[in-house]
Design a protein with these regions (language model features):
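An N-terminal, well-structured beta->alpha segment
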Residues: 1-62, 66-67, 93, 146-175, ...
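Short glycine-rich phosphate-binding loop at a beta-alpha junction
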Residues: 41-48, 174-176, 277-283, 421-423
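Phosphate-binding and adjacent anionic-ligand microenvironments
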Residues: 271-449
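Gly/Ser/Thr-enriched, mixed-charge loops and adjacent short helices
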Residues: 14, 107-230
Length: 449
């Protein structure tokens, strides 16, 4: 097994091609069963709506069962729902089968601890070794059983709405919801209707193939047009597994995630519900956000890119809110991980309480000039090569010199796709663009060599 399979969000690939094959999934189930399931001898498995989910679920379940571990099948469930209820299921771990915002033909496997957190790199590296060695101590007697659980969604919804004190707090609002034909389809529209909102639902009929197809948080064009055409007050989109959130105002303009993070932090603080005094984001968040957060009286901390790093820092600081520009936002008192629906509910509650239009509330602050581009490369090996390239490093140094030390350059390999992300910010928009173009050109040259 060549290379590191686990990225920042589990293992991903094209369904029925390595590593997203039934064979690999079965071996991974065996490895997890042998290494991680020693207390309850039980695991929970959920999946999103893509067509390959059932195949991978069956293969994973077979691996766990052969290792003597009982398998609790939860069916289709949003990722934040699984992280929310895992600790209440009396299992050693849970597994989410999803490729998040990717197209239907991709899929992935996320491993979740008994507390609803992600496993560390040491654990996933050990699992890779076990799968590669393929030497498992199996028995004809010690086999697991399948258990079907239809209560996980109900458990999640009870938690997800626990912070809502009145019965119809969204009465009189008109909201457009794009469910990305994913795991929140049929769930999120009903929750908002129950809270009094007038709801227009988009992309709410998954067929196994249409998940994230020209919809959801990564493709919100239809959302924007619908909000404007329907004279709605707000537009909300999630991705296929429900851990990302995108919001647009009543004029169909996207509200960047950094603005939403600051908005939620301020709302919870004003309501007297903020725990701690810090807000966490990443090294590629806009510098204007940091200034705004500090001006609100918070301390501001940045981490490397990725939800796991953000959550770890939030746990260390004991604070309520963290997130990143990708749309992953965590409100720790109400969710274990990025939860598109919970965060959308909080945004809507704050908006409804303000009595203002969303376009009157946002923007909270003006962004400093920046360029953020994900450069697609041949494979992950080329991503690593580009990140380590002396020529690319020289271009980064030259860019920093061009901006006279008043800018910031970050190169970050995607943890889920063969892309190298380039982020450049500074006070001079022309110099920022020139610097970014220079770095991107150097990266692209590597593909031509």
């Amino acid at each position: 097994m060549a290379g590191k399979l686990f990225g920042t969000d589990g293992v991903r690939g094209v369904a029925n091609f390595y590593p997203m094959t039934a064979d690999f999934a079965t071996k991974l189930g065996m490895a997890c069963g042998a290494e991680l399931c020693q207390v309850y001898r039980k695991v929970a498995i959920a999946r999103d709506t893509r067509i390959s989910g059932e195949m991978l679920q069956s293969a994973l379940a077979a691996g766990f069962l052969s290792a003597g571990v009982d398998v609790v099948l939860l069916g289709v469930l949003p990722t934040p729902a699984l992280t929310s209820v895992t600790a209440d299921l009396d299992v050693d771990m849970s597994v989410m089968i999803t490729a998040s915002h990717n197209p239907y033909y991709d899929n992935g496997i996320k491993l979740i601890t008994s507390n609803g957190d992600k496993f560390d790199d040491d654990t996933t590296s050990k699992l890779e070794v076990l799968v590669a060695e393929n030497k498992f101590d199996l028995s004809s007697e010690k086999l697991g059983r399948i258990i079907y659980n239809n209560e996980a969604l109900v458990m999640y919804l009870e938690k997800a709405k626990s912070f809502i004190s009145s019965s119809k707090p969204l009465a009189g609002t008109r909201i457009v919801l794009d469910c990305a034909n994913g795991s929140f389809s049929g769930i999120m529209p009903q929750v908002f209707k129950d809270l009094g909102a007038g709801v227009i639902s988009l992309e709410n009929e998954p067929d196994g193939y249409n998940i994230n197809r020209d919809c959801g948080s990564q493709h919100p064009e239809k959302l924007y047009e619908t909000v404007k055409g329907a004279h709605a007050g707000i537009g909300i989109a999630v991705d296929g597994d429900g851990d990302r959130l995108l919001v647009c105002d009543d004029e169909g303009h996207k509200i960047p995630a950094e603005q939403l993070i600051a908005f939620l932090a301020k709302y919870l603080k004003d309501e007297g519900k903020y725990r701690g005094n810090a807000v966490v984001s990443t090294i590629i968040s806009n510098t204007a956000m940091e200034r705004y957060i500090r001006n609100l009286g918070f301390e501001y901390y940045s981490t490397k890119v990725g939800e796991r790093a953000i959550i770890a820092k939030m746990q260390e600081l004991g604070c309520s809110v963290g997130g990143e520009e990708s749309g992953h936002m965590v409100v720790a008192d109400y969710s274990k991980s990025g939860d598109g629906m919970v965060n959308a509910l909080l945004v809507c509650l704050a908006w409804a309480a303000s009595g203002k239009k969303m376009s009157e509330i946002f923007p909270l602050f003006k962004f400093d000039p920046y360029v953020f581009v994900s450069v697609p490369l041949k494979d992950r090996a080329m991503v690593a090569e580009a990140a380590a390239s002396e020529k690319v490093k020289a271009a980064v140094s030259e860019a920093e010199n061009i901006m006279s030390g008043k800018g910031r350059v970050v190169l970050h390999p995607s943890g889920t796709e063969p892309k190298l992300r380039v982020w450049v910010s500074g006070s001079d928009e022309t110099l920022v663009k020139k610097s970014a173009d220079m770095i991107i050109a150097e990266i692209n040259k590597l593909q031509e060599e």
